[in-house]
Swiss-Prot record:
One of its GO terms (cellular component) is cytoplasm. It comes from Rickettsia bellii (strain OSU 85-389). This is Arginine--tRNA ligase. Its EC number is 6.1.1.19. It catalyses: tRNA(Arg) + L-arginine + ATP = L-arginyl-tRNA(Arg) + AMP + diphosphate. The lineage of its organism: Bacteria, Pseudomonadati, Pseudomonadota, Alphaproteobacteria, Rickettsiales.
Length: 576
């Protein structure tokens, strides 16, 4: 058990002893204070109990201090501010983290999670109308890494892609592909406004011509539409899947929107909501600002989404009687719940930020307040090439595709760099910086740290085999790792599982990248310190025992960096 969980467990035990209640203590946090002056770890347990019991928090804190002071791994306890309990941990307890990382990983990575939670995370879900652009890559990486983190800490997770194959954009795609088909047969064509002018559809038209010849020209229009639609969607979906594969992004399920229509699931969901009294006849207010040409004031079927926190009730049928896109969303959420998911996570692009409340309302209604929902928005990526922004429009035919950028810098750089900013903040992707070999390039800095640790171990095997053999045998005296710099790194290593736990709790995969950058920085600083002072070198040929201990430290750093890169989906480099 890592030090964070150990302290949490002991706080729960103390809470039971003092107040005959362990449940309250489950809500207490164990954090690392921003200022090391406040100790190694801190807890808010006293304030949580004080609020429940209506007693002064410092009085509660003092009671906990009296009990927890007896723990063998606690060096000292101080009460700060309104009632924070700050703990200083004995050095040998930090050293235990190194042993666990090297000899007992399952113990080190032990994290308590809700075993009854079944998570469905939907991400990417790009319309199958063209190659994926670099903006899609941000949501793809965010969702994929978040899913990896959730799995790593122990949750069952389904990674899902929603194929939007039933909307008006598909009609435009079909119209464009038919034109490209005619072009492949020798006709001169004009791509009219509103269609997709990109050259990526030329080979789709050619493939259609190769398979069908000119048979489609004189075919019934409806039959031709169906054939071309299925053909084009499959080609575009294959293209998107290939883009995702090159990015290292994996999904467990590709779910077709069209199946919701074909299988009557929209009708069934609407009937369920009608029986719940959540569907009614009414009208929606005009859009704010300039009235859209397609808006009309009419009576229509609406879902009572305002009952669940939405800004307005949502139409489920269009004027022509067909289902709205939102009606499909309702049925899709119901399908996820029917498949056993009790926590739905949606990862959307910045252009879908207006969908948050309606999605939340949908899940709350269909899950009857028993299914949790979180909607995460990934902001835009400012992609620059030679100082010129690249347009990102499938319709204009000029955009920075995932494939373009992947071929330019590689998937590992893309995946790591997409996590160097929080998902709700705009990200600048600098093609020049990401290829530099300097500490200004975060992925290089982290990979270089990994390579350096391996280099230390390799060099020790050659120059001081006695130390290396002792290290390999697990015979090392970690108490020799006593410098302030070494202890700081060990504390950071010990917090790796806490970082994963926090990243999972708040759906913030960037915490993993930030952690790795911090660890790499501290390791490089320690390594450079050894260049200035021989006593701090990892390998000291006339000090076998200290070298052995530092080899254990180097190996622990290597394993944690490799673990972090694995979570991100980046291959750890072994040489540069």
């Amino acid at each position: 058990m890592n030090i964070f969980n150990k302290l949490k467990h002991d706080i729960i035990t103390a809470s039971t002893q003092l107040y005959n209640n362990s449940e309250i203590a489950n809500h207490a946090s164990i954090e690392t204070p921003k200022d090391s002056f406040n100790g190694d770890l801190s807890s808010n347990i006293a304030m949580i109990i004080a609020a429940k019991k209506n007693v002064p928090p410092r009085e509660v804190a003092l009671k906990f201090k009296e009990i927890l002071n007896e723990l063998p791994y606690i060096a000292s306890i101080e009460i700060a501010g309104p009632g924070f309990i700050n703990f200083t941990i004995k050095a040998d307890s930090w050293h235990t983290a190194i042993k666990d990382i090297l000899q007992n990983e399952s113990k080190f990575f032990e994290i308590d999670v809700d075993k009854n939670k079944n998570i469905n995370i939907e991400y990417v879900s790009a319309n199958p109308t063209g190659p994926m652009h670099i903006g899609h890559a941000r949501g793809a990486v965010y969702g994929d890494v978040l899913a990896n983190i959730l799995k790593k800490v122990g949750y069952p997770v389904t990674k899902e892609y929603y194929v939007n194959d039933a909307g008006s954009q598909i009609n435009d795609l079909v119209s464009t592909v038919i034109l490209r088909y005619r072009e492949a047969l020798g006709e001169k064509i004009t791509i009219t406004e509103g269609l997709y002018p990109g050259e990526y559809l030329i080979p789709v038209g050619q493939a259609l011509a190769k398979e069908y010849g000119d048979k489609l020209l004189n075919m019934d229009e409806l039959e031709r539409f169906k054939i071309v639609k299925n053909f084009a969607i499959q080609k575009m979906l294959d293209l998107n899947k290939e883009d995702l594969k090159e990015l290292g992004v994996k999904h467990d399920v590709f779910f077709s929107e069209q199946t919701l229509h074909d299988n009557g699931k929209i009708e069934k969901t609407v009937k369920l909501l009608t029986d719940m009294g959540l569907i009614y006849e009414g009208s929606v207010p005009a859009p704010k600002g300039k009235v859209h040409a397609e808006w009309e004031n009419r009576t229509q079927e609406l879902f009572k989404s305002t009952k669940y926190g939405d800004d307005q009730d949502r139409p489920i049928r269009k004027a022509d009687g067909s289902w709205t896109y939102f009606a499909s969303d309702l049925a899709y959420a119901k399908d996820k719940i029917d498949r056993g998911a009790n926590h739905l996570i949606y990862v959307l692009g910045a252009d879908h930020s207006g969908y948050v409340k309606r999605i939340e309302a949908t899940v709350k209604a269909l899950g009857k307040e028993q299914v949790k929902v979180d909607v995460k928005i990934c902001q835009l990526v400012n992609f620059v090439e030679n100082g010129v922004p690249v347009k990102m429009s499938k319709r204009l035919g000029t955009f920075a595709s995932v494939q373009d950028v992947n071929h330019e810098v590689g998937k590992d750089i893309i995946r790591f760099m997409m996590l160097t900013r929080e998902n709700n903040k705009t990200l600048d992707f600098d093609l020049i910086k990401v290829k530099e070999q300097s500490k200004e390039n975060p992925i290089f800095y982290v990979q270089y740290a990994h390579v350096r640790t391996l280099s230390i171990l390799s060099k020790a095997m050659e120059t001081i085999p006695q130390s290396y053999n002792s290290f390999e045998a697990g015979t090392y005296d970690l108490s020799l790792l006593s410098s302030e710099e070494e202890i700081e790194i060990i504390k950071l290593l010990a917090s790796w599982t806490k970082t994963l736990e926090t990243a999972a709790k708040y759906f913030e995969p960037h915490r993993v990248a930030f952690y790795l950058i911090n660890l790499a920085s501290k390791f490089h600083a320690l390594w450079n310190f050894g260049k200035e002072n021989n006593d701090y070198r990892f390998i000291i040929e006339n000090n076998v025992e200290l070298t052995t201990a530092r080899l254990a430290l180097a190996k622990a750093i290597q394993k944690i960096i490799a673990s972090g890169l694995e979570v991100i989906g980046v291959e750890p480099m072994t040489r540069m």
